[in-house]
From Swiss-Prot:
It comes from the Eukaryota. Residues 285-389 are annotated as: Disordered. This is Zinc finger C3HC-type protein 1-like. Transmembrane segments: none annotated. GO terms for molecular function: zinc ion binding. The keyword Nucleus applies. Residues 377-388 have a biased composition (Low complexity). GO terms for cellular component: nuclear envelope.
Length: 478
C-alpha cells in the first residue's frame, strides 16, 4: 500500500501543480495582439450580414409602401375578381397584403399563403352574408403564423380622400388639371346631360377655373397661365371636370392618350371616345351675340391641331393647302336624290369643288339653304366614321373607387344623434372634394375683392356649355 502511495504522490506534488495552474491562467488572458484581431473579426460580422433580409424591416417597408400597396390593387381585374361586395373590394384585400393571382384566388405578398375567396350562388341571403363575414375574417387570419400583415396592415389614408386637408385637396386637384391639359383636344367630350346629373353648372366651373388661376399665380408669381400646356378655354373646362372626378394622366409626347385613376387604378384609352370638338375658340367667342348651330360647331377645326388617331387616316390632307378647304361643302345635304346618286357614283378626289363641278358650285352659291363653312383641315370623305360615345367621368371608375362612393366617416356610435345625422349625410368622394374646393375659392374671394377677370371668363364658360347643350339636343333629335 505504501508503494502505491509513493507512485501517486509525484503527480500531486507542489512543484508540479503551480505550473499547471499558471498555464491555465495564461490561456485565459488575452494579449493586445489577439484582442485587436478579435475586434477586426467582430467588425466584419455586420458586413457579412448585409445581404440578410430582416423580417421586421421588410414588414415595415411593405406595410408603409404606397407604391407596393397600389401594385397589389392593380393585380385585381374585373375578370379575376368579380361579383364581390364592397367589404371584399381590392382596397381591403391589398390592405392586408393580398394580391389577386387567379380567379377568386389570393396570395400573400409576404408569407405566400393562399386564400380562396369564391362566393357560391345561394338562394338564402343569410348564408351569403355569413360567407362574406367569414372571408372578411380570413383576410386577417389566413396568413401564416409569423406573418406581420394581421398586426400591421396598410393605413387607410393610402386610398382615402383627405377632404379634411384643404391644402392637400387643392394641390392634388391643380396637379391633375395641369397633367390633363397636356392632352389638349385629345381630351374626351363630356355629355351635357351627365353634367346636369352631377349638378355641375357653368358657375361652378367658373369658380374652379378661378381657383386654379389663383393657385398657379401664387406658385409661379405670374399673371397669366403661360405655364399650362394649353391656353384653350374648352380644354381647360374638360380638364377641370375630369380632374374634379379624380382623373389624371402621365401623357408624354408620342405616347398613347390614356387617362387613369390613381385610386382604383383604372386606365382608359381616349381613342375609344369622342374627343373634344375641334373649335377655333378665338373666332367662336369673339361674337357673343351670334348663335352657333350644333352642325357648324361640329365642323370647325383649329389650324395646325389634329389628334394622332386622325393623322393616320387623314395624312393626305397635308398635301393640300388650307385655302382650298374654303370651297368644300357637303353637297349630299343640299342636292336632290338623283343628283346625290350622281355625285356618289363618281370617285371622291381632292379636286372636288373645281373643274367639272364648277356648275355644281354655282348652284350651291345661289341656293338659299347654303350655310357658310369654316375652313377645315379634315376631309369630309375620310373613312374615320366609327361611332364614338361621350366620356362619363363617373361611370368609368370602378364600382369600389373612393371617388364614386360615400366617404367613410369615423365611428360615431357613442356620439350624439346630431353628429350621427351629419355623418349619414356624407356625399360621394368627388362631391366632397368639390365642396372643399368651392369653400376654398369662396374664402379667397372674400379676402381678395379684385375679381375683374371673372365675368369675362364666366361668360365664355357659359357659351361653351350652351354649345355642348345644343350639340347634345341635336344628337338626340336628328
Amino acid at each position: 500500500m505504501a508503494t502505491s502511495c509513493e507512485d501517486v504522490s509525484p503527480v500531486k506534488s507542489p512543484a508540479v501543480t503551480p505550473l499547471k495552474i499558471r498555464e491555465l491562467i495564461n490561456e485565459g488572458i488575452v494579449t493586445g495582439e489577439r484582442s485587436s484581431i478579435g475586434r477586426k473579426e467582430t467588425a466584419v460580422v455586420p458586413e457579412e450580414n448585409n445581404g440578410f433580409e430582416d423580417p421586421l424591416s421588410n414588414s415595415s417597408y411593405e406595410s408603409t409602401s404606397k407604391d407596393a400597396f397600389f401594385g397589389r390593387v392593380e393585380s385585381f381585374s374585373s375578370l379575376k375578381w368579380a361579383g364581390k361586395p364592397s367589404e371584399l373590394c381590392p382596397l381591403i384585400c391589398a390592405k392586408y397584403g393580398w394580391s389577386n393571382i387567379e380567379c377568386d384566388m389570393l396570395k400573400c405578398s409576404s408569407c405566400n399563403a393562399y386564400l380562396c375567396a369564391s362566393l357560391q350562388p345561394v338562394l338564402d341571403f343569410s348564408k351569403y352574408k355569413q360567407r362574406c363575414v367569414e372571408l372578411q375574417e380570413a383576410l386577417r387570419k389566413a396568413h401564416e403564423k409569423f406573418c406581420f400583415w394581421p398586426d400591421s396592415p396598410c393605413p387607410d389614408y393610402f386610398w382615402a380622400l383627405m377632404v379634411t386637408e384643404p391644402s392637400s385637396v387643392l394641390s392634388d386637384f391643380v396637379g391633375r388639371f395641369d397633367n390633363l391639359c397636356h392632352l389638349e383636344i385629345q381630351l374626351p367630350s363630356i355629355k351635357h346631360e351627365d353634367l346636369k346629373n352631377m349638378d355641375i353648372t357653368e358657375e361652378t366651373v367658373s369658380h374652379l377655373l378661378r381657383l386654379i388661376e389663383d393657385e398657379l399665380k401664387s406658385k409661379d408669381g405670374r399673371e397669366d397661365n403661360s405655364r399650362l400646356a394649353s391656353d384653350s378655354l374648352q380644354v381647360h373646362i374638360s380638364a377641370c371636370i375630369l380632374a374634379l372626378c379624380g382623373w389624371s394622366t402621365s401623357y408624354t409626347s408620342g405616347s398613347l392618350c390614356i387617362i387613369n385613376c390613381p385610386r382604383c387604378m383604372r386606365k382608359v384609352g381616349l381613342w375609344a371616345f369622342q374627343q373634344l370638338e375641334a373649335v377655333e375658340l378665338d373666332n367662336s367667342l369673339s361674337a357673343p351675340n351670334t348663335p352657333v348651330s350644333p352642325a357648324e360647331g361640329h365642323e370647325r377645326s383649329p389650324f395646325g391641331i389634329m389628334s394622332p388617331n386622325r393623322r393616320v387616316t387623314r395624312s393626305r390632307d397635308a398635301e393640300q393647302s388650307p385655302a382650298l378647304a374654303y370651297g368644300r361643302t357637303r353637297s349630299s345635304d343640299l342636292l336632290s336624290p338623283a343628283d346625290s346618286e350622281a355625285v356618289r357614283s363618281r370617285p371622291v378626289t381632292r379636286s372636288m369643288g373645281q373643274g367639272e363641278s364648277s356648275g355644281l358650285s354655282n348652284e350651291l352659291h345661289s341656293s338659299p339653304l347654303r350655310r357658310s363653312k369654316r375652313p377645315r383641315l379634315c376631309s369630309s370623305s375620310s373613312s374615320d366614321t366609327s361611332p364614338r360615345g361621350c366620356f362619363d367621368p363617373l361611370s368609368q371608375h370602378r364600382s369600389w373607387c373612393p371617388w364614386v362612393n360615400v366617404c367613410q366617416a369615423s365611428e360615431t356610435s357613442t356620439l350624439g344623434s346630431e353628429i350621427q345625422e351629419e355623418a349619414s349625410r356624407k356625399e360621394y368622394g368627388w362631391k366632397e372634394v368639390l365642396n372643399v374646393l368651392l369653400a376654398e375659392e369662396n374664402s379667397r374671394t372674400l379676402s381678395d375683392p379684385d375679381t375683374s377677370s371673372v365675368p369675362e371668363k364666366s361668360h365664355k364658360v357659359f357659351r361653351i356649355f350652351r354649345q355642348w347643350q345644343m350639340a347634345a339636343s341635336a344628337s338626340e333629335n336628328p
